[in-house]
Swiss-Prot record:
Residues 180-221, 282-313 are annotated as: Disordered. The record marks Y63 as: Priming of reverse-transcription by covalently linking the first nucleotide of the (-)DNA. GO terms for biological process: DNA replication; symbiont-mediated suppression of host innate immune response. Terminal protein domain (TP) is hepadnavirus-specific. Spacer domain is highly variable and separates the TP and RT domains. Polymerase/reverse-transcriptase domain (RT) and ribonuclease H domain (RH) are similar to retrovirus reverse transcriptase/RNase H. Residues 178-346 are annotated as: Spacer. Activated by host HSP70 and HSP40 in vitro to be able to bind the epsilon loop of the pgRNA. Because deletion of the RNase H region renders the protein partly chaperone-independent, the chaperones may be needed indirectly to relieve occlusion of the RNA-binding site by this domain. Inhibited by several reverse-transcriptase inhibitors: Lamivudine, Adefovir and Entecavir. It catalyses: DNA(n) + a 2'-deoxyribonucleoside 5'-triphosphate = DNA(n+1) + diphosphate; Endonucleolytic cleavage to 5'-phosphomonoester. Keywords: DNA replication, DNA-binding, DNA-directed DNA polymerase, Endonuclease, Host-virus interaction, Hydrolase, Inhibition of host innate immune response by virus, Inhibition of host RLR pathway by virus, Magnesium, Metal-binding, Multifunctional enzyme, Nuclease, Nucleotidyltransferase, RNA-directed DNA polymerase, Transferase, Viral immunoevasion. Residues 357-600 form the Reverse transcriptase domain. Its EC number is 2.7.7.7, 2.7.7.49, 3.1.26.4. This is Protein P. Residues 196-221 have a biased composition (Polar residues).
Length: 843
């Protein structure tokens, strides 16, 4: 007869009328009983022939592809002019006096941040914007391009100008070596890599070797480049020999040089800061490749003028035309949906390229990307704004993956010890926290995003634009990209972006200037940064509490008035060092703080209500007697694991689910097991704050017997059959708790001390978790343990009771910025379980 739920509760000793604990509890360690119960509750893992269920409520499992939804009305969020002050450390010292070693170390980590991957794979520019929304490709392309442009304007990205230079907006840092006024000229006196012959973005000409005197050759005539090309091309002139082969047989496209959708024209548009408009472009100039000396924001740079659309210079098979977008202007419309209708809407489409206020030298940066980007909703509650997702997962994959530094996540008990108090709380919102931390320019070549330009994007979409060899350079080929879809999309986008459509249709390569979210290093750096800032604030206001996890900052003070004045002082300090706060999102919590998914008050902590509601919904939808795919189980365990510390049996209750996930098997919920879990999660108990105290109760065990020392009283007992030592020690601790009621117990067993009961026989783990809930353990060495003798059957010998004080720990989220080293390996299950899984360390 299957095991009923009331019978099962009784078996687990969860009812009050259970028999004598010393007799009942050891039975739960019996393997046979555990096996029979598992069979009854269907917990062993059957190889099920019934098809697996792949969806439970909102949880999807294997073989499910969630189709993302594109929102054509997405707004691009605005980024304030974020600039973390370079003299951050100096400002902190003015605020609080000399910084501690830990604070200094953490702040130096991010000023500037560095990123050195072992290997970087470069992808073609076409992979820059991911085709994430097949039905809205053009729309997504422009919205993403606009987002990238916004980030560049906000000083968060560098724009690759040439192989060795980049431009950016905003305030420069001292480690960003600016191209000095005039250092882009040909007469390069410095022997080390300042950019010469700067054709700014296209990077067509590389710098010559030191001391080469090409300057005169360029000033002889407007056609100097044409005449001296032979001399330029000889190998003695450093690497500039590349120009000749480039002009004649273009094989690779530098960042600014794009083939049209048809591959017939190369864009050698000038990228000077004073980019000329179409009026200038359409002037008649010499059809040959002419050079002019123009004054750009970096000084006198020699640049290549764009060749006007009218003039075609045959060079091999191809023809050098200016810009794909503007070529449509001088052509006959091919249909009602020809792009030339849109291009003729405006006389002046603005510059082909924009340049930043500052130009810097960078390491060699290829015209490639290292990660793709796409847009999604900002968060489940805000679908009006978009968020840029950057996929730099290449750095976390394969055998060249970067092992990201681990950092301490505050565990639940530490958080409760620290924040469960009668303080009044408020939380601060740091806007775009990741984009505060500057990256060294040396990291730029590893973190490249961008796009290949609309023409190539469209060429990939349009099935008709198969480029045949004999078609090279024909106008028909240009119009291959015209289609009704593209026409309608561009017409709608024209309302939003106006003449920026032209700018966005050009290719671009951008590198990160601030830390991107898609790299495992970023969360670590952000956590280090905010914890150091909080440490500084705590030392400046010792009577208050400041605490942070990632970009979540909370402030606590004794009274509301006190909190308000603290808020003003801290806000002013943060603004003075360049940290941007979103003051409209400041939340005042009163005496119960909502933080990291918990509600924390003076009584302890509980999960927030929205999590409790999710759990209830999950149980409502949970099917019984149907095999559920392990991926769904993983998601269910992720949700239940978060609230497990607040239940009677804790994590051990979820062990059958963990086992099925590890074995990648389906799991069948029996009615009894579901009822058991449901009851567990319907009644949540707060996790209370630990109190300091003196340990008066000690437990010890041998495989055959147990012993307790409760004050001056000694007790002992034997087990019916020998047990594994850890199991025996756990039983002894349970007896000590039930006999004495003490919340502080001394033990010499590290497993009991860690309070992880998941490796014990299942039934025992569940029962012990409930008996020992809220108990704190103190480590006592075996030689000094007063319960050692009774456990060996010697009651006559009295060792004196130790004075063992217990001090609750706040873990590695310590109040002062002291941070012990992180253990090298945590069990795999930690990832989706809960912060509670960080073990207690013996004091």
């Amino acid at each position: 007869m299957p095991l009923s739920y009331p019978h099962f509760r009784k078996l687990l000793l969860l009812d009050d009328e259970a028999g004598l604990l010393e007799e009942e509890l050891p039975r739960l360690a019996d393997e046979g009983l555990n096996r029979r119960v598992a069979e009854d509750l269907n917990l062993q893992l059957p190889n099920v022939s019934i098809p697996w269920t792949h969806k439970v409520g909102n949880f999807t499992g294997l073989y499910s592809s969630t189709v993302p939804t594109f929102n054509p009305d997405w707004l691009t969020p605005s980024f304030p002019d974020i600039h973390l002050h370079q003299d951050l450390i100096h400002k902190c010292e003015q605020f609080v006096g000399p910084l501690t070693k830990n604070e200094l170390r953490r702040l130096k980590l991010v000023m500037p941040s560095r990123f050195f991957p072992k290997v970087t794979k470069y992808f073609p520019m076409e992979k820059g914007i991911k085709p994430y929304y097949p039905d809205n490709v053009v729309n997504h392309y422009f919205k993403t391009r606009h987002y990238l442009h916004t980030l560049w304007k906000a000083g968060i990205l560098y724009k690759r100008e040439s192989t060795r230079s980049a431009s950016f907006c905003g305030s420069p840092y001292s480690w960003e070596q600016e191209l000095q006024h005039g250092s882009t000229s040909i007469n390069d006196t410095k022997g080390h890599g300042t950019e010469s012959l700067c054709t700014q973005s296209s990077g067509i000409l590389s710098r010559p070797s030191a001391g080469s005197s090409i300057q005169g050759k360029f000033q002889q005539s407007r056609l100097g480049l044409q005449q001296k090309q032979g001399q330029l091309a000889n190998g003695k002139q450093g690497r500039s020999g590349r120009i000749r082969s480039w002009v004649h047989t273009p094989t690779r496209w530098p960042a600014g040089v794009e083939p049209t959708g048809t591959g017939c024209a190369y864009n050698i548009a000038s990228r000077s800061a004073s980019c000329f408009h179409q009026s200038a472009v359409r002037e008649k100039t010499n059809p040959s490749l002419s050079t002019s000396k123009r004054h750009s924001s970096t000084g006198h740079a020699v640049e290549l003028n764009p060749v006007p659309p009218g003039s075609v210079r045959s060079e091999g098979k191809g023809s050098v035309l200016s810009c794909w977008w503007l070529q449509f202007r001088d052509t006959e419309p091919c249909s009602d949906y020809c792009l030339s209708h849109i291009i003729n809407l405006l006389e002046d489409w603005g510059p082909c390229y924009e340049h930043g206020q500052h130009h810097i030298r960078t390491p060699r940066t290829p015209a490639r990307v290292t990660g793709g980007v796409f847009l999604v909703d900002k968060n489940p509650h805000n679908t009006t704004e978009s968020r840029l997702v950057v996929d730099f997962s290449q750095f976390s994959r394969g055998n060249t993956r970067v092992s990201w530094p681990k950092f301490a996540v505050p565990n639940l008990q530490s958080l409760t010890n620290l924040l469960s108090s009668n303080l009044s709380w408020l939380s601060l919102d740091v806007s775009a926290a990741f984009y505060h931390l500057p990256l060294h320019p040396a990291a730029m070549p590893h973190l490249l995003v961008g796009s290949s330009g609309l023409s190539r994007y469209v060429a990939r979409l349009s099935s008709t634009s198969r480029i045949h060899d004999h078609q090279h350079g024909t106008m028909q080929n240009l119009h291959n990209s015209c289609s009704r879809n593209l026409y309608v999309s561009l017409l709608l986008l024209f309302k939003t972006f106006g003449r920026k459509l032209h700018l966005y249709s050009h290719p671009i390569i951008l590198g990160f200037r601030k830390i991107p979210m898609g790299v495992g290093l970023s969360p670590f750096l952000l956590a280090q940064f905010t914890s150091a800032i909080c440490s500084v604030v705590r030392r400046a206001f010792p009577h208050c509490l400041a605490f942070s996890y990632m970009d979540d900052l909370v402030l606590g003070a004794k009274s509301v008035q006190h909190l308000e004045s603290l808020y003003t002082a801290v806000t002013n300090f943060l603004l003075s060092v360049g940290i941007h706060l979103n003051t409209s999102k400041t939340k005042r919590w009163g005496y119960t703080l909502n933080f990291m998914g918990y509600v924390i008050g003076s009584w302890g902590s509980l999960p927030q209500d929205h999590i409790v509601q999710k759990i209830k919904a999950c149980f409502r939808k949970l099917p019984v007697n149907r095999p559920i795919d392990w991926k769904v189980c993983q998601r269910i365990v992720g949700l239940l694991g978060f609230a497990a510390p607040f239940t009677q049996c804790g994590y051990p209750a979820l062990m059958p689910l963990y086992a099925c996930i590890t074995a990648k098997q389906a799991f069948v919920f029996s009615p009894t097991y579901k009822a058991f879990l449901c009851q567990q999660y319907m009644h949540l108990y707060p996790v209370a704050r630990q109190r300091p105290g003196l340990c008066q109760v000690f437990a010890d065990a041998t495989p055959t017997g147990w012993g307790l020392a409760i004050g001056h009283q000694r007790m002992r007992g034997t087990f019916v059959a020998p047990l594994p030592i850890h199991t025996a020690e756990l039983l002894a601790a349970c007896f000590a708790r039930s006999r004495s009621g003490a919340k502080l117990i001394g033990t010499d067993n590290s497993v009991v001390l860690s309070r992880k009961y998941t490796s014990f026989p299942w039934l025992l783990g569940c029962a012990a978790n409930w008996i020992l809930r809220g108990t704190s353990f103190v480590y006592v060495p075996s030689a000094l343990n007063p319960a050692d003798d009774p456990s060996r059957g010697r009651l006559g010998l009295y060792r004196p009771l130790l004075r063992l004080p217990f001090q609750p720990t706040t873990g590695r989220t310590s109040l002062y910025a002291a941070s012990p080293s992180v253990p090298s390996h945590l069990p795999d299950r930690v990832h989706f379980a809960s912060p509670l899984h960080v073990a207690w360390r013996p004091p």
